[in-house]
């Protein structure tokens, strides 16, 4: 039937030949001749090259391993985010940013038809180039001729399982979770608690920014088109991998340092990562909105390292970064490293023996091999889900806004752009019953197509809770009856008491000394005595309030609780370089990198009755937040939020907060259903008692030895043992004869330095991907 419907040419048999090109891990290839299957009538096939450029789906037929295989490909419409930009520099160093209208139609993903476990990442720009799997076998395909025509010869590389060779190791087997100690007052990325708690069901969007250094520019003969094609193919592969986690990786921008490197890049991967992190945090946010940035470098890192990233820092303004060495001509090996380092940003550990990998090798395997990673292990999936429970992850749930998109709107690309109400893809792809796929408009008679306040294509009633309060410093958000979207997240007014009076709310958080001690030193830590904090009046590096250049400013008497953080107990295994200083019952940390305020009391911390720390000063709450009696100015059942705006209490409809019909309706429902539930429960108990009596009577009868049916035994639920991450080993060096500053009493010092040298930053822990291979 398929043959009758499609215009097909016969395939020549594949001809095995000896390898004439040398690729990492590949000894030989065979020649195949992919034939494109055209689903059009002959009279419609007039300009195949032009038609292919715009087709959403493609099929290619070829002989693979002696059998006919049909490769189904679907265009990756989200490879480039709307508003994609490219930045380069002219000979004078002037920055030039463009928004090229790139037709990324030649980048596809798909699978082999009728194969249960199969996937593919293919570029059709100049023949077929990329990866696909068939069963347990992985293949790489690329054209042998520069001439693009149907049926041209391609090299098909087969990766032999017997050639698998773990000749590389990773030095970060014992990575610890590290909490972000950046200023908690920053509300840009706030913890997301999904209502149903099932992160897997929600689509995530990673806005991906790639920077290529000057060495890369020269490595590819200063040919920006060649670099672009290579980068797009790598990004396409990374996107294919993360789609398995219901996550879209869209390239929002690419930057090439065409004149010179903007940072100091050295073989020391940690040093390079730290420099790139600082450059990214100070330069990129003003240029382009993005969630993560990676540097691709031609510099060979020292030892076996080919990649490095901070641990569990996705969405962080400075540390959501990674550096990757362009270590192989095989771009998919480099793409695998890019995906691996991104995994560390999501808090994924390296896979160990207890992890279940559904493919030959998974993304977070600790070593590079001849295989390209094709999936995530069970451990990686658990770590990924945990990231969304514990970390700041808002940036991954916000798809680009229509007003942020500067490219020409295209209906059917699954991105809502200017002039569109919705975009559910093509008519074949669309599953949204509220959206007209042909016009990208809401269907007649409907009000909305999606959102927390949209139900069955209609707005939910005003006052219905769409985002419950997460904690005592948060406020619930209610639908307004005019939109399908839930309003922006709002918090309690800054200065609202929390943690049983131990703190005051600030931007949705409740900063306390105890919380900060636990974050720094781990469980079992407690806040040190007041006498320890009095040392902040000394103005030494073991007790001060502020740092101005290299000068340490002592605390005033009233501000001692707002300077250096002093704690008791806890662990001495810290992930940062520096000195652990202990005297009497006081313990503090002196970081090697003074640019980050590790070990200082955070803004918003309570320092007295109705007083909080702001910029190392203990000030009145009213002076700090100007929120006193704010709620008294709100009308109806409303309270003040963190921006001193009035917001309705739960169950009261905006904007006036005087309509409780939602609460009244709920009360009626409860009043009706409660008696019904009670009656149902009583009936169930009576029936159960009667059944029990009948069963007892039957049990008293003699048992027959014939004609009995075996009872099906209920399986006992198996206990799943949780696998704990290995503890990080640390090299500890005791230093005894350190000079004592001023009248400081003798103190014991402990230099905390991981055996793997991470960048000296606060919360994030760096994690590397190592390759002992000669750089391929």
Swiss-Prot record:
Bias kind Basic and acidic residues: ranges: 691-701
UniProt signal peptide: 1-19
Catalytic class of the enzyme: hydrolase
Residues annotated as catalytic: 341
Database matches in SUPFAM superfamilies: Blood coagulation inhibitor (disintegrin), Metalloproteases ('zincins'), catalytic domain
GO biological process, any: proteolysis
Pfam family name, one: ADAM_CR
Extracellular membrane side: 194-666
Cofactor binding note from Swiss-Prot or TrEMBL: Binds 1 zinc ion per subunit.
Binding site for Zn(2+): 170, 340, 344, 350
Organ and tissue specificity: Expressed at high levels in epididymis and at lower levels in lung.
GO cellular component, one term: plasma membrane
Superkingdom of the source species: Eukaryota
Region (Disordered): 691-728, 746-776
UniProt KW keywords: Disulfide bond, EGF-like domain, Glycoprotein, Hydrolase, Membrane, Metal-binding, Metalloprotease, Protease, Signal, Transmembrane, Transmembrane helix, Zinc, Zymogen
Residues modified by glycosylation: 268, 275, 352, 558, 603, 629
Sequence ranges assigned to domain Disintegrin in this UniProt record: 408-494
Segments forming domain EGF-like: 626-658
Record's protein name: Disintegrin and metalloproteinase domain-containing protein 28
Native organism: Macaca fascicularis (Crab-eating macaque)
């Amino acid at each position: 039937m398929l043959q009758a419907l499609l215009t097909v040419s016969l395939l020549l048999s594949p001809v095995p030949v000896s390898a004439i090109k040398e690729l990492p891990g590949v000894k030989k290839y065979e020649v195949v001749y992919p034939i494109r299957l055209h689903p059009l009538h002959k009279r419609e096939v007039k300009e195949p090259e032009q038609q292919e450029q715009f087709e959403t789906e493609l099929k290619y037929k070829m002989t693979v391993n002696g059998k006919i295989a049909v490769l189904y490909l679907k265009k990756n419409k989200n490879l480039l985010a709307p508003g994609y930009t490219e930045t380069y520099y002219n000979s004078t160093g002037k920055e030039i940013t463009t928004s090229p209208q790139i037709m990324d139609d030649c980048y596809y993903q798909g699978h082999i038809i009728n194969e249960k476990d199969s996937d593919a990442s293919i570029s059709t720009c100049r023949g077929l180039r990329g990866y696909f799997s068939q069963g347990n076998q992985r293949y790489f395909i690329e054209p042998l001729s520069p001439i693009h025509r149907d049926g041209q010869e391609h090299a098909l590389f087969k990766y032999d399982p017997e050639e698998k060779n773990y000749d590389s190791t990773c030095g970060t087997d014992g990575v610890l979770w590290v909490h972000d100690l950046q200023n908690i007052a920053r509300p840009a990325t706030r913890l997301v608690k999904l209502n149903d708690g099932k992160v897997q069901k929600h689509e995530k969007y990673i806005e991906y920014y790639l920077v290529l250094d000057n060495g890369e520019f020269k490595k590819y003969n200063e040919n920006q088109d060649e670099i672009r094609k290579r980068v797009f193919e790598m990004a396409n592969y990374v996107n294919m991998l993360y789609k398995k986690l219901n996550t879209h990786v869209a390239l929002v921008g690419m930057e090439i340092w065409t004149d010179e490197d903007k940072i100091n890049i050295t073989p020391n991967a940690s040093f390079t990562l730290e420099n790139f992190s600082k450059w990214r945090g100070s330069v990129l946010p003003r240029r382009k909105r993005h969630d993560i940035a990676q540097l691709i470098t031609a510099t060979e890192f020292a030892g076996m390292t080919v990649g490095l990233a901070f641990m569990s820092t996705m969405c962080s303004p400075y540390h959501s970064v990674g550096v990757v060495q362009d270590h192989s001509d095989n771009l998919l090996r480099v793409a695998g490293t890019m995906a691996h380092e991104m995994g560390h940003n999501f808090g994924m550990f390296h896979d160990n023996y207890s992890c279940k990998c559904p493919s030959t090798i998974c993304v977070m395997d600790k070593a590079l091999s001849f295989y390209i990673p094709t999936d995530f292990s069970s451990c990686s999936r658990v770590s990924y889900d945990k990231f969304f429970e514990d970390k700041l992850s808002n940036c991954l749930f916000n798809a680009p806004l229509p007003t942020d998109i500067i490219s020409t709107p295209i209906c059917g690309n699954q991105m809502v752009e200017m002039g569109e109400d919705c975009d559910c893809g093509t008519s074949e792809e669309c599953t949204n019953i509220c959206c007209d796929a042909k016009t990208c408009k809401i269907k007649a008679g409907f009000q909305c197509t999606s959102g927390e306040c949209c139900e069955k294509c209609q707005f939910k009633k005003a006052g219905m809770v769409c985002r419950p309060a997460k904690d005592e410093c948060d406020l619930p958000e209610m639908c307004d009856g005019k939109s399908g979207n839930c309003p922006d997240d709002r918090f309690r007014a800054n200065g609202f008491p929390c943690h049983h009076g131990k703190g005051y709310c600030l931007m949705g958080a409740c900063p306390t000394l105890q919380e900060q001690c636990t974050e720094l030193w781990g469980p079992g830590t407690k806040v040190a005595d007041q006498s320890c904090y009095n040392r902040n009046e000394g103005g030494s590096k073991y007790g001060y309030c502020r740092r101005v250049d290299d000068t340490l400013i002592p605390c005033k008497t009233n501000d001692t609780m707002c300077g250096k953080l002093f704690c008791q107990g806890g662990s001495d295994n810290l992930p940062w370089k520096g000195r652990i200083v202990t005297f009497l019952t006081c313990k503090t940390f002196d970081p090697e990198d003074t640019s980050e305020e590790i070990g200082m009391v955070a803004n918003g911390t309570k320092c007295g009755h109705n007083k909080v720390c702001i910029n190392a000063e203990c000030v009145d709450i009213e002076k700090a937040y100007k929120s006193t009696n704010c709620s008294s100015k709100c009308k109806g059942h409303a309270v003040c939020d963190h921006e001193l705006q009035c917001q309705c209490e739960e169950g009261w409809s905006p904007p006036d907060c005087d309509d409780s019909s939602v609460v009244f309706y709920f009360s009626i429902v409860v009043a009706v259903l409660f008696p019904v539930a009670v009656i149902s429960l009583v009936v169930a108990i009576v029936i159960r008692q009667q059944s029990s009596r009948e069963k007892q009577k039957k049990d008293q009868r003699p048992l027959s030895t014939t004609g009995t049916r075996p009872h099906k035994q209920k399986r006992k639920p198996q206990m799943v043992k949780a696998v704990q991450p290995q503890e990080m080993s640390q090299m500890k060096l005791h230093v005894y004869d350190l000079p004592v500053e001023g009248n400081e009493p003798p103190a014991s010092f402990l230099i905390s330095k991981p055996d793997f040298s991470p960048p000296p930053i606060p919360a994030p822990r760096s994690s590397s991907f190592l390759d002992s291979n000669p750089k391929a």
